[in-house]
Amino acid sequence: MVRIAGTDIPDNKQVYFSLQYIFGIGPARSEKVLVQAGVDKAIRVNKLTDEEINRLREIIDKEYRVEGDLRKEIALNIKRLIDIGCYRGNRHKHNLPVRGQRTKTNARTRRGPRKTVAGRGQKRGATKK
């Protein structure tokens, strides 16, 4: 396996798809890196020469923020929003959707599993017999 930016990328796949295993590199950025390095995107990783692998490593390390650095930057951005006390920061702090989605129903992924409340199973106004 080839190791680029601290991530093992699979040997048996095309370079275009293998680069996407690195956090911070998606389809568009993968293609951009391959064009800059002058590597065919259809070639498999195990067919790459050492020179091509080094060019890919160099381009990714110099020009893009990936893996740990990117994760750290994202975490610091969220922390900054929380520290300044803005609306988005408060939404992050309370584990609610940040981008304006409804929360009366749905938003279960962000809010977590339902918290059951005693006595909520009956309809209002109904009396027991």
Swiss-Prot record:
PANTHER family: 30S RIBOSOMAL PROTEIN S13/40S RIBOSOMAL PROTEIN S18 (PTHR10871), SMALL RIBOSOMAL SUBUNIT PROTEIN US13M (PTHR10871:SF1)
Lineage of the species this protein comes from: Bacteria, Bacillati, Chloroflexota, Dehalococcoidia, Dehalococcoidales
Function: Located at the top of the head of the 30S subunit, it contacts several helices of the 16S rRNA. In the 70S ribosome it contacts the 23S rRNA (bridge B1a) and protein L5 of the 50S subunit (bridge B1b), connecting the 2 subunits; these bridges are implicated in subunit movement. Contacts the tRNAs in the A and P-sites.
UniProt-listed Gene3D superfamilies: 1.10.8.50, 30s ribosomal protein s13, domain 2
Record Pfam families: Ribosomal_S13
Residues that span the membrane, as ranges: none
Region listing for Disordered, in residue ranges: 92-129
Keywords (A to Z) from UniProt: Ribonucleoprotein, Ribosomal protein, RNA-binding, rRNA-binding, tRNA-binding
Top-level taxon of origin: Bacteria
Protein name: Small ribosomal subunit protein uS13
Cellular component GO terms, alphabetical: cytosol; small ribosomal subunit
A biological process term (GO) from this entry: translation
Compositional bias segments (type: Basic residues): 92-114
Molecular function in Gene Ontology: rRNA binding; structural constituent of ribosome; tRNA binding
Family, as annotated: Belongs to the universal ribosomal protein uS13 family.
Self-association and partners: Part of the 30S ribosomal subunit. Forms a loose heterodimer with protein S19. Forms two bridges to the 50S subunit in the 70S ribosome.
